[in-house]
Amino acid sequence: IILNTLQENGKITNSKLSKLVGISAPATLERVKRLESAGVIASFTVIVDHEKLGYLITGIVNLSLNLSQLTSVEGIKKEFAALDEVVECYQISGENDFILKVISKNIKTYAEFMNNKLTKIDGIRFIKSSFVIDSVKENRTFLFDLDEEYKM
């Protein structure tokens, strides 16, 4: 219950959380601290609606690498991670090697990102961009079915 509740509402007070869990406030706080210490809770954050801030383009970029041009896969991972426009980056198996989720104000700034940043990275063999037309599901939580709440 603790993990699921915190994913849905990270701003819930410890008092309200303890009532939901059915244990005392100090015991609830101790469990949350143990979950943080164990790395189960990685961070508390705010989810921003980027469109309301004028970032209207979400691009999904599929990339394949030219391994003969790479000095290291770790190096290219660092280059992708350093790009401010990239909000998610996954190394994947299958036809492509990476998928990037890119946020941009408009198609012009997206093109500038592609032309001035992404295509300048050595070792990329293939780039294919797709654009999100509609977000059907953007669930940033995963509801866990844990009988004993991770025994923390």
For the regions a language model picked out, list residue spans one by one.
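A compositional/biophysical signature of low hydrophobicity enriched in polar/charged and small residues
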Residues: 1-152
